[in-house]
């Protein structure tokens, strides 16, 4: 998706330089203004096409990009902003797919081993020039610990796109989503595409169950609440294992009763999306099957009624 014509990249790169050419000519030699306008239009057109978004991802090889910013969210969660080659660069990542991060991880015997993990960005192509990743560090997570140890200015190896799911408008009547922890990232991408990319006649409904341990663990809550307020076709239902006093949302693990209460019933035009810790996803596959949804495969395919990222 291209940035809007009112974005800073066009203001600084096209409009201001063109205006300076015309104004400067009018001050120095008014008779030449018509020529300066023609020159400004020609240069502006050339610059406009130069600034058109350029996709940088390559699924066949890793590329190195610079870590531009690291924003600490909590003791084990951070947002990593990766700078792309130019202000007009975009990943070109299909909605619902992810990128791979690779690194050489030291081994106990002194050797190193390439480890690769997949992450879904929380930013989109409408924000050119960079990509944001939300990553939670785990004690046994090789790549998450590697990312946590990086300093701004160091490089990150990126490859992609990757994944079997690609969102298309009106692909189903109703999405039911269940996410746990950082499993919210692919859901956010799909929800944002539905809410902010609705065409006339698109009536896609979305219900999301988002499970976490405590209220403080709820990632991207402001973004989710803003999307729910923006579009009555999207509803989010929070579930906490250790809720605070006065909590009115769900409590404990996600149960069949919660799925029945908040998510759509099985139908050919309904799709359930799952993302979270493996034990959670495994349990949810069994729960959805027990409720009448088609049995989820070990490795999901786009056409599956229950799809696990």
Swiss-Prot record:
Query: What PANTHER family does the record point to?
Result: NADH-CYTOCHROME B5 REDUCTASE, NADH-CYTOCHROME B5 REDUCTASE-LIKE
Q: Per its database record, what is this protein's job?
A: NADH-dependent reductase for DPH3 and cytochrome b5. Required for the first step of diphthamide biosynthesis, a post-translational modification of histidine which occurs in elongation factor 2. DPH1 and DPH2 transfer a 3-amino-3-carboxypropyl (ACP) group from S-adenosyl-L-methionine (SAM) to a histidine residue, the reaction is assisted by a reduction system comprising DPH3 and a NADH-dependent reductase, predominantly CBR1. By reducing DPH3, also involved in the formation of the tRNA wobble base modification mcm5s 2U (5-methoxycarbonylmethyl-2-thiouridine), mediated by the elongator complex.
Annotated residues that bind FAD are located at 148-163, 174-208
What pathway does the UniProt record associate with this protein?
Protein modification; peptidyl-diphthamide biosynthesis
**Name of the protein this chain belongs to:** NADH-cytochrome b5 reductase 1
- Single GO MF descriptor: NADH dehydrogenase activity
Keyword set includes Oxidoreductase: yes
Q: Which residues form a coiled coil?
A: none
Which UniProt key words apply to this protein? FAD, Flavoprotein, Membrane, Mitochondrion, Mitochondrion outer membrane, NAD, Oxidoreductase, Transferase, Transmembrane, Transmembrane helix
Family membership noted in the UniProt record: Belongs to the flavoprotein pyridine nucleotide cytochrome reductase family.
Reaction catalysis annotation: 2 Fe(III)-[cytochrome b5] + NADH = 2 Fe(II)-[cytochrome b5] + NAD(+) + H(+); 2 Fe(3+)-[Dph3] + NADH = 2 Fe(2+)-[Dph3] + NAD(+) + H(+)
- What main location does UniProt list? mitochondrion
């Amino acid at each position: 998706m291209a940035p809007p014509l009112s974005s800073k990249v066009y203001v600084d790169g096209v409009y201001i330089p063109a205006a300076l050419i015309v104004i400067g000519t009018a001050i120095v030699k008014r008779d030449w203004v018509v020529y300066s306008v023609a020159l400004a239009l020609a240069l502006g057109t050339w610059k406009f096409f130069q600034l058109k978004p350029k996709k940088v991802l390559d699924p066949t090889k890793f590329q190195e990009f610079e870590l531009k910013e690291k924003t600490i969210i909590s003791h084990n969660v951070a947002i990593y902003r990766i700078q792309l080659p130019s202000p007009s660069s975009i990943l070109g990542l299909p909605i619902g797919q992810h990128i791979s991060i690779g690194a050489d991880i030291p081994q106990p015997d002194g050797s190193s081993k390439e480890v690769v993990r997949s992450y879904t960005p929380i930013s989109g192509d409408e924000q050119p020039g960079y990509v944001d990743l939300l990553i939670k560090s785990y004690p046994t997570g090789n790549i998450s610990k590697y990312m946590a140890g990086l300093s701004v200015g160091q490089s990150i190896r990126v490859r992609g796109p990757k994944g079997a799911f690609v969102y298309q408008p009106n692909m189903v009547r109703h999405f039911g989503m269940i996410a746990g922890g950082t499993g919210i990232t692919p859901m956010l991408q799909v929800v944002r595409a539905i809410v902010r990319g609705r065409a006339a006649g698109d009536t896609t409904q979305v219900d999301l169950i988002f499970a976490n341990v405590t209220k403080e663990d709820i990632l991207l809550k402001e973004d989710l609440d803003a999307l729910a307020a923006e579009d009555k076709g999207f509803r989010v239902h929070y579930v906490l294992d250790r809720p605070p006093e006065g909590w009115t949302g769900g409590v404990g693990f996600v149960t069949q009763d919660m799925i029945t209460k908040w998510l759509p019933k099985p139908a050919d035009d309904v799709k359930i999306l799952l993302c979270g810790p493996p034990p959670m996803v495994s349990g949810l596959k069994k729960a959805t099957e027990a409720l009448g949804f088609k049995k989820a495969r070990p490795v999901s395919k786009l056409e599956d009624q229950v799809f696990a990222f």
